[in-house]
């Protein structure tokens, strides 16, 4: 029997991250029967910081850096990430070799009781500045309370009565078979999702041309174009996970549309921009939308947020 070549996949150990890695594993093995994939679970620095706010500890990059370190040290061949956890720009030594077909990108509200009985001053759990900003516009009287942990942990905290509602990504709930917990889907044009939300990125080394060729079979063109435009917005703005920035691109009837927002965390200021164009110019459209945000006062707002 010919021994199959082994591909080592590194990922976080959370149930959602392991689901995503297993999905990528199956896609690779189905497309390349001569390959066998092995998943290596990694507890990242972000996972270890269970009580501190991410904004006080280095941001969402803490969920990515340890996985990237494994790639650079050649302890793994590929890393599987949630795109929304990644920086806007790839470093010179690493690249996203495949964008997996995007799941539902919307944010959703999960309520402890019934949506109809949610009080105007409800305690809503989220740690995302983007969600906090838009929640204050959606439900001005609500009280925002920090929440950390994976999907299961957050749902358990809601069920235990620490919150009256929480906001999560629809994609994670659907992938884990928890769609029945969703009470309300936010309109992505009004409550704009995180950059790359719902998309999985498979990262590899820039000098590993064999792996890049292999990953092409997994790459979903429409997802790549949409995420490229969204990431370009943040690349030009220079925001981080502490900045209330959102961008969401869609392709419908051959029309490419990009929506973006920049705001203050208290929701008192929200700047929006929209652009329609050719999907082949995804990055240029992203830069153009970012420029529109800056021209509407986003430049001074960013300076204020970074002080």
Swiss-Prot record:
GO terms for cellular component: cytoplasm. InterPro entries: HemC, Porphobilin_deaminase_cofac_BS, Porphobilin_deaminase_N, Porphobilinogen_deaminase_C, Porphobilinogen_deaminase_C_sf. Its cofactor is dipyrromethane. One of its GO terms (molecular function) is hydroxymethylbilane synthase activity. Keywords: Porphyrin biosynthesis, Transferase. Its EC number is 2.5.1.61. Binds 1 dipyrromethane group covalently. It holds the Pfam family Porphobil_deam. GO terms for biological process: protoporphyrinogen IX biosynthetic process. It catalyses: 4 porphobilinogen + H2O = hydroxymethylbilane + 4 NH4(+). The modification S-(dipyrrolylmethanemethyl)cysteine is found at residue 241. Pathway: Porphyrin-containing compound metabolism; protoporphyrin-IX biosynthesis; coproporphyrinogen-III from 5-aminolevulinate: step 2/4. Gene3D superfamilies: Periplasmic binding protein-like II (3.40.190.10), Porphobilinogen deaminase, C-terminal domain (3.30.160.40). The porphobilinogen subunits are added to the dipyrromethane group. Monomer. Tetrapolymerization of the monopyrrole PBG into the hydroxymethylbilane pre-uroporphyrinogen in several discrete steps. Belongs to the HMBS family. This is Porphobilinogen deaminase. It comes from Coxiella burnetii (strain RSA 331 / Henzerling II).
